[in-house]
């Protein structure tokens, strides 16, 4: 009996303990559920607030984009109007420059004076001996942009006695490209269609010339060495060191070019620096000997390029940053250009500045390289005044 009572007491005690633990567990779970419900309610509240802020931000962004779109349209309209006004001003400037050109800087071989007394002293026989070619530029007739190929600086030119085009990409390399025609160059993707020509020594600057099947270039060496390269036989035909002490650029705005080799109707020439001015040398295209030298008195400052037509040097000037290029200094080795007929030519505004200008006497065109663009300028020529009216005999 006692055992039964003891067993019942133990059973009741165990049941009471289990009830206590169960109640504690339920209380814990209930508290955790309440905490989770509070967190969920807080998350919902924050989510609603974030959604509200996002909608407000989207509305503000949409309003701002709409305002920016209106401002952009207005700015574009203003820029188009400004561009039209600038074009109109440039056309008016072209007209004014054509009608009232400022007096150019003209230099002649012997400091020519235009007085009648001096003119009468000149002999007619001497005049006809010197003037092998008697053309002078009167104006730019047309401009054509062929394509854009390669580096901002370079050179392209054509041998006057063939249809081949030669491209020098950059200012220092030993590789150039030959194209059989203008059409082949125009249709080529880059220089892919060109024939690659590798010369023994790297060329320097953009002062190269192609004349009668030969390439004449300044070698990139410690000396100012002219290399004559046979384009037919792919071999060096001759070399010569120019007797020039200065290694300054011949044109201030193109510091890579130390000497500019030029070919025209009368043969091969070299333009080189001498102090603050540009000097000219007539070269024998066969032996590379220097036959005669002149001080053109054309300043190197702000010069970007030059070209020669019929023994007359035309130096092209610009500004930094680039503006409109212009011929502002003319030098005639035949002493046949007067102040009144020396042209002051403005080139159309383009992309940057000329890194090279090469004249083709057969086509009467300039091959120009401007910020990677290959440009052709068609020239209008006329007879020099003294060719039309030679000085009288004594």
UniProtKB/Swiss-Prot annotation:
Stretches of the chain forming a coiled coil according to its record: 29-94
Q: Please provide the record's keywords in A-Z order.
A: Coiled coil, Developmental protein, Disulfide bond, Glycoprotein, Secreted, Signal
Record keyword Lipid metabolism present: no
Q: What compartments host this protein?
A: Secreted
* Signal peptide boundaries: 1-18
* Keyword Disulfide bond carried by entry: yes
Q: Which residues are glycosylated?
A: 169, 204, 233
User: Membrane-spanning regions, if any?
Assistant: none
Domain annotation Olfactomedin-like: ranges: 132-383
Matches recorded under PROSITE patterns: OLF (PS51132)
Family, according to the entry, reads as follows: Belongs to the OLFML3 family.
Name-wise, this protein is Olfactomedin-like protein 3B
Species this protein is from: Danio rerio
Question: Which gene name does the record give?
Answer: olfml3b
């Amino acid at each position: 009996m006692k055992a039964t009572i003891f067993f019942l007491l133990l059973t009741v005690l165990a049941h009471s303990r289990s009830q206590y633990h169960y109640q504690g567990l339920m209380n814990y779970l209930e508290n955790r559920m309440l905490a989770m419900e509070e967190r969920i309610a807080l998350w919902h509240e924050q989510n609603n607030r974030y959604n509200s802020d996002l909608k407000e931000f989207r509305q503000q962004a949409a309003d701002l984009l709409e305002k920016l779109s209106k401002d952009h349209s207005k700015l574009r309209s203003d820029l188009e109007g400004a561009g039209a006004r600038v074009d109109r001003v440039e056309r008016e400037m072209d007209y004014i420059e054509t009608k009232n050109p400022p007096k150019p800087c003209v230099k002649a071989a012997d400091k020519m004076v235009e007085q009648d007394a001096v003119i009468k002293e000149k002999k007619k026989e001497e005049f006809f001996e010197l003037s092998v070619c008697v053309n002078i530029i009167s104006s730019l007739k047309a401009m054509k942009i062929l394509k854009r190929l390669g580096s901002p600086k370079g050179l392209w030119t054509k041998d006057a006695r063939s249809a081949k085009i030669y491209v020098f990409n950059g200012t220092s390399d030993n590789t150039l490209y030959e194209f059989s025609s203008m059409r082949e160059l125009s249709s080529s993707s880059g220089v892919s269609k060109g024939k690659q020509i590798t010369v023994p020594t790297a060329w320097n600057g953009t002062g190269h010339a192609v004349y009668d099947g030969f390439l004449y270039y300044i070698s990139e060496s410690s000396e100012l060495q002219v290399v004559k390269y046979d384009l037919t036989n792919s071999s060096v035909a001759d070399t010569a060191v120019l007797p020039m002490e200065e290694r300054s650029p011949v044109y201030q705005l193109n510091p890579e070019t130390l000497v500019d080799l030029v070919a025209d109707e009368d043969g091969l020439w070299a333009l080189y620096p001498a102090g603050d001015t540009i000097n000219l040398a007539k070269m024998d295209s066969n032996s590379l000997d220097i036959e005669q030298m002149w001080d053109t008195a054309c300043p190197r400052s702000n010069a970007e390029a030059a070209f020669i037509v019929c023994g007359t040097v035309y130096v092209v000037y610009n500004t930094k940053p680039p503006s409109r290029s212009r011929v502002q200094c003319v030098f005639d080795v035949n002493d046949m250009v007067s102040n009144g007929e020396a042209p002051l030519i403005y080139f159309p505004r383009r992309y940057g500045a000329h890194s090279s200008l090469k004249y083709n006497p057969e086509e009467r065109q300039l091959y120009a390289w401007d910020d990677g663009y290959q440009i052709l300028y068609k020239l209008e020529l006329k007879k020099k005044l003294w060719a039309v009216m030679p000085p009288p005999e004594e």
